[in-house]
Regions:
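Mixed-charge, Lys/Arg-rich low-complexity intrinsically disordered regions
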Residues: 2-60, 68
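Short hydrophobic/aromatic-rich beta-strand motifs
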Residues: 58-62, 81-83
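Short regulatory "switch" loops immediately downstream of catalytic or recognition motifs
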Residues: 63-68, 97-100
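Intrinsically disordered, low-complexity, charged/polar segments
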Residues: 98-194
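Short beta-strand-centered aromatic/proline hotspots
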Residues: 69-88
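A short, compositionally biased
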Residues: 55-56, 86-90
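Short, solvent-exposed secondary-structure boundary/capping segments
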Residues: 89-97
């Protein structure tokens, strides 16, 4: 089966669009919108790497069943998370689904400044901490996205998104918000980072 990531990259190449450019981001956003929700298919994508234990700075995807879902106003069952650090019973992470796609792209562009290298390959990670995010104005978008995830409530394999696919992954329609729509969540998030 052809990888979704491969198909999107191939179209950009055919159109002469350079990888990791603004034009590539716009093309990916447009094409992914046509695809519709991709949650189940993405877990089978060959370009993602299964990780038993992800590292701090990895971008990861997984199915999540929150411990306190009955009291949460809304939650995402398929987070796209950048792992920030360890936490009691799990880890702290930035779930990018809490931002609308255009803001995700802006935020990712800022976060790329923290990449451990500019190769954007399997070894590349984000080098971020809560204190860095909190202290730096350009990282203000992290506020509504910063979550505590409990390991025992992860109900699928953890899939690592390699750095070469970060710009594509942020546009995939994999969010699975419960109780409220994506749009509602994004409006609430905007109140936190404005």
């Amino acid at each position: 089966m052809a990888s979704l990531f491969d198909a999107l990259e191939a179209e950009a190449f055919r159109k002469g669009i350079q990888a990791r450019s603004i034009e590539a981001s716009k093309l990916f956003m447009k094409n992914v919108a046509k695809l519709g929700p991709q949650t189940k298919a993405i877990l089978k994508d060959e370009r993602l790497t299964t990780k038993n234990k992800p590292f701090i700075g990895d971008m990861i995807m997984y199915t999540y069943n929150p411990k306190f879902k009955k009291t949460l106003p809304y939650y995402d069952m398929f987070p796209l998370t950048i792992m920030v650090g360890p936490a009691p019973g799990g880890f702290y992470g930035i779930n990018l689904h809490y931002l609308p796609p255009k803001i995700r792209a802006i935020f990712l562009d800022h976060l790329n400044d923290t990449a451990t290298n500019q190769k954007f390959n399997k070894t590349t990670r984000f080098k971020i901490t809560y204190n860095l995010l909190k202290a730096t104005k350009k990282y203000k978008y992290f506020k509504p996205c910063f979550k505590h995830y409990l390991s025992e409530h992860i109900s699928s394999n953890i899939m690592k998104v390699n750095a070469s696919e970060w710009n594509i992954a942020i546009f995939l329609q994999t969010a699975k918000f419960k109780k409220k729509s994506d749009t509602f969540v994004w409006v609430q998030s905007k109140k936190e980072y404005q």
